[in-house]
């Protein structure tokens, strides 16, 4: 017998809306069980999705999706949404090759009107859709669901300020799962929320505003303040949103459908706006291990449902994130000017390790990358040595601050760029594909990439020693190569690479962790009679010009390999060769970069193979440069 008999009857939200209201809770219960079962098989973001099961069910029951546009901020909580919107039969393909995305994706379903994975974009996108609807004379609803973490970012407030000024008929649902804004909610709060979301209250309030326009200013201002005070006293938490021009409704229990459904129905039928509905939920709701340790179940690998034990593979190599955190701790023990900064990703970047050792010198600024960079710049002006640890994909959000506030002033901010290159299951939205290109064009910037975890230790020490300009150190997600680790980091000579293996026919110049693939390719090429040099550039800027020219002069073929897009390391090498006349027929130069597409999720190994950046692809590129076909030449040499 099925564990989800009612959910089995639902293919789309239209099927859900045919059910009686007293059946909706059973759907939510079954939806939660299906979400738990699916994620236990695939892994993925977990706690946030469990927290919005009732909210997801209620929204699709009340609103006419996809005609009514539903936007999930970040999108990592959208697994229940995907199950209800025609994708249940593929839910166990989440984050695998050819399977469902771990986030909302426009090309995946009409029920995903806006793709997401980075935070705080939903209200801006929703306002754009609402304005487009009004311009076209439509009457559909637009709903943006945003978390209490995401709403802390400046972009969300910019959008709310704009929406309030326009009196747009937009619905924003604040999913507060940290209890960070409001106290626990109760029956009186639910009653008042229902009252304030209703048509009678809104009509009276609008009438009061119109009357106020004809009263003397002093009296009108006092009346408005009294009204705001009374709402704040009774409701709590809404004054800020009211000041931005929103009707504030809440806080309400996001797991109580008896509260959620009537309020959503009232707001759905409203002719004015915008609304902010404050819903309080619990991360991991309905699964005891996740409720007890929400941080450990934010994102999970495959796990045992009965115990909650996650099936993490053992490794002999440390993760790059841990190596960075531990290296920074060692450096900070010798230098009290070192501080660590993260934008809401302490465990993802290794800053949590630093925080345990130096809590007073650790700053988590929240989802505020722009602020993080300029905050670091301010610290640098006062002689401190800020390490701003941030994912490559999120540093994009603070590019003007990097340019204007850091590079232009040559301030020694140290950027520790995590998740450089392809990241696997999180796919294109989280790939660190572009930082080589967008940082490499900036004056005053030192840019280096670790080829393994031991090099990372030395590069952290190198950044500590750079006090006259900004520096960027990039390294990938995941585990290192298992190399021998140094006891302490030793600063490297700026702008100097190293030769790993000497040959005379082919030169492979790597920037980053593709070095291991270069070494594999060199072995295969040597077996085929092609003597191959392997070099580790270490620095993209300043580039080791002497090394580049030496490789070009002493080899027939020079190939660069990097985990980044066009416009990065290979482009800089080509520019150098062109300036020295080395591309005038003297050397066959090829730059291996990520393809000019957004690569979908898969394992990192498969993604790099598909991108043409593994050892096999390197060997193939060498034969292409020679003007020979690899398979035929292999047979000939054999």
From Swiss-Prot:
Stored Pfam families: DXP_synthase_N, Transket_pyr, Transketolase_C
This protein's pathway: Metabolic intermediate biosynthesis; 1-deoxy-D-xylulose 5-phosphate biosynthesis; 1-deoxy-D-xylulose 5-phosphate from D-glyceraldehyde 3-phosphate and pyruvate: step 1/1
Amino-acid positions noted as binding Mg(2+) in the UniProt annotation, renumbered to this chain: 148, 177
Needed cofactors: Mg(2+); thiamine diphosphate
Cofactor note: Binds 1 Mg(2+) ion per subunit.
Binding positions for thiamine diphosphate per the UniProt entry: 76, 117-119, 149-150, 177, 287, 369
InterPro entries: Dxylulose-5-P_synthase, THDP-binding, Transketo_C/PFOR_II, Transketolase-like_Pyr-bd, Transketolase_BS, Transketolase_C, Transketolase_CS
GO process terms (BP): 1-deoxy-D-xylulose 5-phosphate biosynthetic process; glyceraldehyde-3-phosphate metabolic process; terpenoid biosynthetic process; thiamine biosynthetic process
Keywords of the record: Isoprene biosynthesis, Magnesium, Metal-binding, Thiamine biosynthesis, Thiamine pyrophosphate, Transferase
GO molecular function: 1-deoxy-D-xylulose-5-phosphate synthase activity; magnesium ion binding; thiamine pyrophosphate binding
Catalyzed chemical reaction(s): D-glyceraldehyde 3-phosphate + pyruvate + H(+) = 1-deoxy-D-xylulose 5-phosphate + CO2
Enzyme Commission no: 2.2.1.7
Subunit annotation: Homodimer.
Annotated function: Catalyzes the acyloin condensation reaction between C atoms 2 and 3 of pyruvate and glyceraldehyde 3-phosphate to yield 1-deoxy-D-xylulose-5-phosphate (DXP).
Family of this protein: Belongs to the transketolase family. DXPS subfamily.
Protein name: 1-deoxy-D-xylulose-5-phosphate synthase
């Amino acid at each position: 017998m099925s564990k989800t008999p009612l959910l089995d009857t639902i293919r789309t939200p239209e099927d859900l809306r045919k059910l009686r209201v007293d059946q909706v809770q059973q759907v939510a219960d079954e939806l939660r069980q299906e979400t738990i079962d699916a994620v236990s098989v695939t892994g993925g973001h977990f706690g946030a999705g469990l927290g919005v099961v009732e909210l997801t069910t209620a929204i699709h029951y009340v609103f006419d999706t996809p005609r009514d546009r539903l936007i999930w901020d970040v999108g990592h909580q959208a697994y229940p949404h995907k199950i209800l919107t025609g994708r249940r039969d593929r839910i166990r393909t989440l984050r695998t090759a050819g399977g469902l995305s771990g986030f909302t994706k426009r090309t995946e379903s009409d029920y995903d009107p806006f793709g997401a994975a980075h935070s705080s974009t939903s209200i801006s996108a929703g306002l754009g859709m609402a304005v487009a609807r009004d311009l076209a004379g439509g009457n559909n609803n637009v709903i943006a669901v945003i978390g209490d973490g995401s709403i802390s970012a400046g972009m969300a407030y910019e959008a709310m300020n704009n929406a309030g000024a326009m009196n747009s008929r937009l619905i924003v649902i604040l999913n507060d799962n940290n209890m960070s804004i409001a106290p626990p909610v109760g029956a009186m709060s639910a009653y008042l929320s229902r009252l304030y979301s209703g048509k009678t209250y809104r009509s009276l309030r609008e009438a009061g505003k119109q009357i106020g326009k004809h009263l003397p200013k002093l009296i009108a201002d006092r009346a408005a303040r009294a009204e705001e005070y009374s709402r704040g006293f009774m409701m709590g938490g809404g004054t800020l949103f009211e000041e931005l021009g929103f009707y504030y409704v809440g806080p309400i229990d996001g797991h109580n459908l008896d509260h959620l459904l009537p309020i959503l129905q009232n707001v759905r039928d409203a002719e004015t706006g915008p609304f902010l509905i404050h819903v309080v939920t619990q991360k991991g709701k309905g699964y005891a291990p996740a409720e007890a340790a929400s941080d450990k179940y934010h994102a999970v690998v495959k796990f045992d449902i009965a115990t909650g034990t996650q099936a993490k593979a053992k490794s002999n190599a440390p993760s790059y994130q841990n190596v960075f955190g531990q290296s920074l701790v060692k450096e900070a023990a010798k230098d009290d000017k070192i501080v660590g900064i993260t934008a809401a990703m302490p465990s993802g970047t290794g800053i949590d390790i630093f925080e345990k050792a130096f809590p007073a010198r650790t700053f988590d600024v929240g989802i505020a990358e722009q602020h993080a960079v300029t905050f670091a710049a301010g610290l640098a002006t006062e002689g401190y040595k800020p390490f701003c640890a941030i994912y490559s994909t999120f540093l994009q959000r603070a590019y003007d601050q990097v340019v204007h506030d850091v590079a232009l002033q040559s301030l020694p901010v140290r950027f520790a760029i995590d998740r450089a290159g392809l990241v696997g299951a999180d796919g294109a939205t989280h790939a660190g594909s572009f930082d080589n290109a967008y940082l490499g064009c900036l004056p005053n910037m030192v840019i280096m990439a670790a080829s393994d975890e031991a090099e990372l230790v030395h590069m952290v020490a190198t950044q500590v020693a750079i006090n006259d300009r900004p520096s960027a150190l990039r390294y990938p997600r995941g585990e290192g190569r298992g190399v021998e680790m140094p006891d302490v980091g030793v600063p490297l000579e700026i702008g100097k690479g190293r030769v790993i293996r000497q040959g005379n026919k082919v030169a492979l110049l790597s920037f980053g962790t593709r070095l291991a693939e270069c070494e594999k390719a060199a072995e295969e090429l040597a077996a085929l009679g092609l003597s191959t040099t392997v070099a580790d550039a270490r620095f993209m800027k300043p580039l080791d010009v002497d090394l580049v020219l030496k490789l070009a002069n002493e080899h027939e073929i020079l190939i660069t390999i990097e985990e980044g897009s066009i416009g990065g390391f290979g482009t800089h090498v080509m520019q150098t060769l062109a300036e020295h006349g080395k591309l005038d027929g003297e050397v066959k130069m090829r730059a291996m970069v990520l393809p000019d597409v957004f690569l979908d999720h898969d394992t990192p190994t498969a993604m790099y193979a598909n991108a043409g950046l593994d050892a096999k692809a390197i060997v193939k590129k060498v034969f292409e440069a020679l003007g020979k076909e690899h398979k035929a030449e292999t047979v000939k040499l054999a």
